[in-house]
Amino acid sequence: MQIGQRLGTPLSPSATRVMLLGAGELGKEVIIALQRLGVEVIAVDRYPDAPGHQVAHRAHVIDMTDAAALRALVEAERPHLIVPEIEAIATDALAAIEAAGLAEVIPTARATQLTMNREGIRRLAAEELGLATSPYAFADSFDAFSAAVAKIGMPCVVKPVMSSSGKGQSVVRSEADVKAAWDYAMAGGRVNHGRVIVEGFIDFDYEITQLTVRAIDPATLATRTYFCEPVGHVQVAGDYVESWQPQPMSAAALQKSRDIAHKVTEALGGRGLFGVELFVRGDDVWFSEVSPRPHDTGLVTLASQRQSEFELHARAILGLPVDPTLGSPAASAVIYGGLDERGIAFEGVRDALAVPGADLRLFGKPESFVKRRMGVALATGANVDEARERAKRAAAAVRPVSSR
C-alpha cells in the first residue's frame, strides 16, 4: 500500500492499519488523530482498559518486552505501521519485524532502539554528532556508580538508562544521597535493571522541548524538517507538571536549539514527530534527551497549534503534509490522581471549564495513584503568562474523589 497517496476504509480489506505499542494518554490522542483520517488502529498495552484501548478499533494486553509475544501479535494483526509510544518494548524484536518486511516501524527500528535507552542516544548525540551535553558516565554496579559520582562531581543527576516520566531519577547533592539515589534508580528502571547514567548538573535558565517533525514536503515529495515553536516546561523529580508555548528565548538560542534538533532527528531518520529536550542558559544550549514520538510537555499543543503534536505525528507517519503553525499562546497544567484507588471520579469540572479559554482532558486511566497523571488542564491567553495562570486555575478546580 502506498500510504499517503491512498488510505483505506477501517474494518475492510482496504484498511490502512496502524499498531500503537503503548496506549496511554499520548497514544490515545494519536489514535484519535489517526481515526479522523480513516485509519484502522490496534492499541497494545501492558494493562487492560488503558486510555488508548478505549478508543481503538481493537485492543490487546501483552508484555511488550516479550519478543515472542510481540512478534506473534504483529503476525496476527499484520499492521502496515508499528508506532512505539513507550520505552518498555522488545526493540530487538521490532528490528527483526522490520527486517522481515512484516511492518514498518516508526520512525525506524534503529531509532527506536537508540532512543529507548539513554546510553544509546547520549552516545549518538555527544560522541557521534558532537552535540553539547552535560558531562556523563554510565555505571552498572554500586561501586562503579560511586566512582562515576566522584568523577562527575556533585550535584549530579542520576537516571536509569531505561525509564520514563522521571521514574528512578534523583539529584545527588552530597555523599549522604549516593546510596539512596542508586536504590531509587534500581527500583525505577523499566527494563535493563542495573545500569544508570550519571549526568553533571547544568545550571540552566530554563528547559524547553523543541517539537520537531520529519514529514513530506508536498512540493518535492522529499522528507523535510519542520519545527514547532519552543515549549517551555517545569519538571518536578523529572516529571512534567506544567508547560507553555511559546517559550520566550533569544534568537541565537532558538537557532541553536533547532540546529541541535535537526542534527539529532536527521541522524535517527524516518518520519514522525520527535520531542527534543534541551537546557538553555542565555544563548547557550545543551542537548538532554529525545523521544521519537509525541512528548508529554507537548500536550499544550492541543490548545496552541493549528495541528496538535498528535495530528502532526499522525500526518507525518502517513506521508501527509503537516502545518506546525502556532495559533495562540497556551499552557497546560497536570491534574494528579491525589489518591490510590480504581475508578475514581472528578468534581469541579464545571468550575474548571468556566475559566476563560480553558479546556480539559481527563485521560480515563482505570486506576489512580497519588502522583499519577490523570488529566491535564489547557488554556489559551493573550500571552503565555495569562495562559499559564488560567491553566493552573482550571487544574486546581478539578478535585479527584473516591467513587466508593
UniProtKB/Swiss-Prot annotation:
Write the Enzyme Commission number(s) for this entry: 6.3.1.21
- Which of UniProt's keywords are assigned here? ATP-binding, Ligase, Magnesium, Metal-binding, Nucleotide-binding, Purine biosynthesis
What reaction does this catalyse? N(1)-(5-phospho-beta-D-ribosyl)glycinamide + formate + ATP = N(2)-formyl-N(1)-(5-phospho-beta-D-ribosyl)glycinamide + ADP + phosphate + H(+)
SUPFAM superfamilies registered for this protein in UniProt: Glutathione synthetase ATP-binding domain-like (SSF56059), PreATP-grasp domain (SSF52440), Rudiment single hybrid motif (SSF51246)
Residues reported to bind Mg(2+): 277, 289
Which GO terms fall under molecular function for this chain's record? ATP binding; magnesium ion binding; phosphoribosylglycinamide formyltransferase 2 activity; phosphoribosylglycinamide formyltransferase activity
Q: Where does N(1)-(5-phospho-beta-D-ribosyl)glycinamide bind?
A: 25-26, 85, 296, 365, 372-373
**Record-annotated residues binding ATP?**
118, 159, 164-169, 199-202, 207
Source superkingdom? Bacteria
Q: Where is the ATP-grasp domain?
A: 123-318
> Which InterPro entries does the UniProt entry name for this protein?
ATP-grasp, ATP-grasp_carboxylate-amine, ATP_grasp_subdomain_1, PreATP-grasp_dom_sf, PurT, PurT/PurK_preATP-grasp, PurT_C, Rudment_hybrid_motif
Q: In which pathway does it act?
A: Purine metabolism; IMP biosynthesis via de novo pathway; N(2)-formyl-N(1)-(5-phospho-D-ribosyl)glycinamide from N(1)-(5-phospho-D-ribosyl)glycinamide (formate route): step 1/1
Q: What is one process in the GO biological process aspect for this record?
A: 'de novo' IMP biosynthetic process
What does UniProt give as GO cellular component?
cytosol
Q: What class of enzyme is it?
A: ligase
Relate the assembly described in the record.
Answer: Homodimer.
What is the protein's known function? Involved in the de novo purine biosynthesis. Catalyzes the transfer of formate to 5-phospho-ribosyl-glycinamide (GAR), producing 5-phospho-ribosyl-N-formylglycinamide (FGAR). Formate is provided by PurU via hydrolysis of 10-formyl-tetrahydrofolate.
Q: Which family does it belong to?
A: Belongs to the PurK/PurT family.
Which HAMAP family does this entry report, sorted A to Z? PurT
Supply the name of the protein: Formate-dependent phosphoribosylglycinamide formyltransferase
